């Protein structure tokens, strides 16, 4: 019997799972919130801009070291039976490192410099740089963005590098390496400077044929090609291949052997596709968490407007992985719940429910034909299909009689409408959707949300019996590179979890939600395309 370890780094916490490679059974789990949290309001007493989201790299390494030690001790498995480790990470999260792979913000003279810290995926301080990159491409060579939806997102690697170049050049000068946080951890585990094709393919303008797009970079800034060559270039390892053996340092720390193979890191949502087993053409997977990432696999590459990327071999070898996304989903539900009147909070406590659970209970009783509230789900900007992080959310249709649960239900519905905009974009560009796999912890907890999605999308929605799909997907990658099965597809088939439940669309609800979607789309196009300045905060 052999085991693998999957390490899942989300927005707020890290999780380490020890998993049986024969059937995907989770043997031991370690979960820890990041001690420093997300740094978004102030840094060491200095106020930060509203769109800054930073983190502390020591949180990642402490979870790595403590978590693996814990699951090994807790499970009591033979260390020789551990064959591989996989890591997923929320992306695009960027770390700036010195020559010794030490994060720059750990240097005392840079501890007050925000641009020396980890830039979390939802850090939107690089919007001006992203807008400029799009303008350059439109003017010089629009084909540069053919496979990025003809957009540049401020969350990606190159805009964030340019942001530091423009706002804190001393940080850029002192950095020897700039890499995704997932690549940073894999490089530590292997004692190599490694890049995953998944991360740089989707977030770094890199493809398997040409490498980095240096022509594009030079048109943006003449210094950018050299910055990328010296600080970002290194051997690229594809998903499904081994990044290397576990380094002697970690062998000694954990009591493991050199046979342990390390997978290149995979973006967390992409790992969720593996975790739920949605690895065939026509399977559409929204990985629903803090935000939502929408993934599809297809043997062909199509230039789809407003879809944020397509990369070969980034999830399953031989297939192109397509990605789109919504910048806030679980965050939206938490935001809505945080606004609940005190009387609702008191009732929730009286009934032994969380405020989210109580609001959902009330929202489930609101018939669709009575819903008159519409929300634009742009509280953290719009990733797809508008790719504009400056857009802000809106609520329409309020009256003096509107109950709070109707507003909360409108938040749930808005995320389904946003997902439908994305699904239609795929289907209108020769990538048909047959089945929807809802991944992540939220679909397990919220049958109401899954029911809304099934009827808004007019598709069967399959929920897998695992709220840990991303961590399980990472463990699958560890098992695969460790040699548990001949191929990654075989690994997934053996280790995926069973179906928890399926939700079929109902004709009456589908018809009712089509009317609400038309209202959402009209507002979406009006405030997102025709008059976006009305949604901007100056």
Swiss-Prot record:
It is an enzyme of class 2 (transferase). GO terms for biological process: L-arabinose catabolic process to xylulose 5-phosphate. GO terms for cellular component: cytoplasm. SUPFAM superfamilies: Actin-like ATPase domain (SSF53067). Coiled coil: none annotated. It comes from the Bacteria. InterPro entries: ATPase_NBD (IPR043129), Carb_kinase_FGGY (IPR000577), FGGY_C (IPR018485), FGGY_N (IPR018484), Ribulokinase (IPR005929). Gene3D superfamilies: 3.30.420.40. Pathway: Carbohydrate degradation; L-arabinose degradation via L-ribulose; D-xylulose 5-phosphate from L-arabinose (bacterial route): step 2/3. GO terms for molecular function: ATP binding; D-ribulokinase activity; ribulokinase activity. Keywords: Arabinose catabolism, ATP-binding, Carbohydrate metabolism, Kinase, Nucleotide-binding, Transferase. It catalyses: D-ribulose + ATP = D-ribulose 5-phosphate + ADP + H(+); L-ribulose + ATP = L-ribulose 5-phosphate + ADP + H(+). Belongs to the ribulokinase family. This is Ribulokinase 1. The gene is araB1.
């Amino acid at each position: 019997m052999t085991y693998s370890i999957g390490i899942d780094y989300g927005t707020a916490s890290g999780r380490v799972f020890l998993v049986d490679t024969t059937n995907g059974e989770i043997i031991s789990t370690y979960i820890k919130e990041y001690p420093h949290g997300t740094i978004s309001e102030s840094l060491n007493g200095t106020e930060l801009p509203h769109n800054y989201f930073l983190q502390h790299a020591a949180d990642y390494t402490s979870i790595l070291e403590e978590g693996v030690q814990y699951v090994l001790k807790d499970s009591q498995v033979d260390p020789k039976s551990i064959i591989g480790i996989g890591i997923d990470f929320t992306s695009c999260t960027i770390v700036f490192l010195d020559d010794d792979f030490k994060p720059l913000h750990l240097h005392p003279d840079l501890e007050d410099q925000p641009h020396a810290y980890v830039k979390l995926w939802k850090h939107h301080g690089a919007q001006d740089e992203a807008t400029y990159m799009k303008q350059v491409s439109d003017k010089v060579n629009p084909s540069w963005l053919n496979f990025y939806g003809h957009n540049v997102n401020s969350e990606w690697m190159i805009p964030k590098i340019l942001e530091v170049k423009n706002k804190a050049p001393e940080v850029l000068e002192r950095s020897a390496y700039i890499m995704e946080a997932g690549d940073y951890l894999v490089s530590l585990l292997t004692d190599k400077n490694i890049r995953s094709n998944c991360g740089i393919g989707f977030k770094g303008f890199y493809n398997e044929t040409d490498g980095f797009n240096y022509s594009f970079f030079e048109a943006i800034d003449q210094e950018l090609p050299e910055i990328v060559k010296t600080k970002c270039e290194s051997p690229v390892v594809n998903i499904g291949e081994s990044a290397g053996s576990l380094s002697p340092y970690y062998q000694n720390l954990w009591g493991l052997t050199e046979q342990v193979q390390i997978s290149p890191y995979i973006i967390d949502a992409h790992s969720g596709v593996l975790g739920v087993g949605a690895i065939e053409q026509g399977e559409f997977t929204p990985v629903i968490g803090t935000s939502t990432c929408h993934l599809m696999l297809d043997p062909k590459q199509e230039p789809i407007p407003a879809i944020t990327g397509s990369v070969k071999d980034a999830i399953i070898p031989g297939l192109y992985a397509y990605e789109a996304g919504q910048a806030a989903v679980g965050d939206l539900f938490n935001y809505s719940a945080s606004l609940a009147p005190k009387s609702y909070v008191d009732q929730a406590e009286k009934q032994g429910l969380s405020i989210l659970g109580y609001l959902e209970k009330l929202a489930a009783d609101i018939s669709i034909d009575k819903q008159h509230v519409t929300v634009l789900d742009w509280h953290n900007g719009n990733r797809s299909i508008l790719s504009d992080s400056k857009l802000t959310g809106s609520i329409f249709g309020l009256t003096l009689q509107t109950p709070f649960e109707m507003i909360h239900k409108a938040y749930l519905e808005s995320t389904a409408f946003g997902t439908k905009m994305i699904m239609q974009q795929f289907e209108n560009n020769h990538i048909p959707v047959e089945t929807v796999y809802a991944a992540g912890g939220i679909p397990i907890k919220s049958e109401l949300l899954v029911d809304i999605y099934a009827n808004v999308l007019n598709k069967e929605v399959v929920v897998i019996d695992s709220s840990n799909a991303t961590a399980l997907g990472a463990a699958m990658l560890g098992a695969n590179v460790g040699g548990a099965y001949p191929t990654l597809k075989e690994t997934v088939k053996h280790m995926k979890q069973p179906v928890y439940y399926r939700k079929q669309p109902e004709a009456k609800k589908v018809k009712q939600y089509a009317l609400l979607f038309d209202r959402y789309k009209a507002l979406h196009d009006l405030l997102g395309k025709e008059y976006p300045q009305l949604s901007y905060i100056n």
